[in-house]
Amino acid sequence: FNPENRRRMQGLGEKEDTTLSSGKSLPFVVTISREYGSGGHHIGELLAQRLGVKFYDRELITLTAQQSGLGECTVQENEQTVNGRLLYDDPVQTAVFRAQSRVILDIAGRESCVIVGRLANFILKGRPRCLHVFVYADEAARLKRIISEYGIENNRAEALLKRTDQERREHCLHYAGCDWGDRYYYHLMLDSSMATDEQVAEAIYSVIHCLAAE
């Protein structure tokens, strides 16, 4: 972990204000962090459809490439990961992270939306009118989804699951200085193995609906 990254992260967003209902003029943004294979992408899509707002996941790769001047392949290879346990930043990965942070801040400033991954909850930490969600599931359910829905071979699924989660965890630690799955950094954490994706999305929608009524 590079301590300088935490200082930079703290300077990205607005002043600390964890009140969800404050800042009424701001767009409402939902960030979804997720364990690999938990269905966070699909749940985010369903939620965005239910809310009638834009959904951002892989689209952020294109937008980050445009912001940074790097190719989309370079962005895809260097986002949400770090090269081992580095004490110092990889210049390309840092350029990608900074460009992606600017993209996320710009999106959050102009439209209500659902954003999946990319440390959006940390980039928007303290910003009013954000709901930060973490989606997880038991390993058996995640492996089943990875194999049946993502088309990953059985003998590769477990290793891919562990590697992807570890990459996300190390990326979060390196750039935010925080534990990726720590409940302190989320308003809502949901076990997707306990319900269908549609039910999980509806549960998040219900929370947002209650907040809007306050």
Where on the chain are the PLM-derived regions?
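Pre-Walker A (Motif I) flank of P-loop NTPase domains
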Residues: 25-30, 111
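Short, amphipathic alpha-helical "lid/cap" segments that border enzyme active or binding sites
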Residues: 101, 197-205
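Extreme N-terminal, non-catalytic leader segments
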Residues: 1-27
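ATP-dependent small-molecule kinase phosphotransfer cores
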Residues: 59, 64-112
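Conserved phosphate-donor/acceptor-positioning beta-strand/loop module used by diverse small-molecule
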Residues: 126-149, 154-164
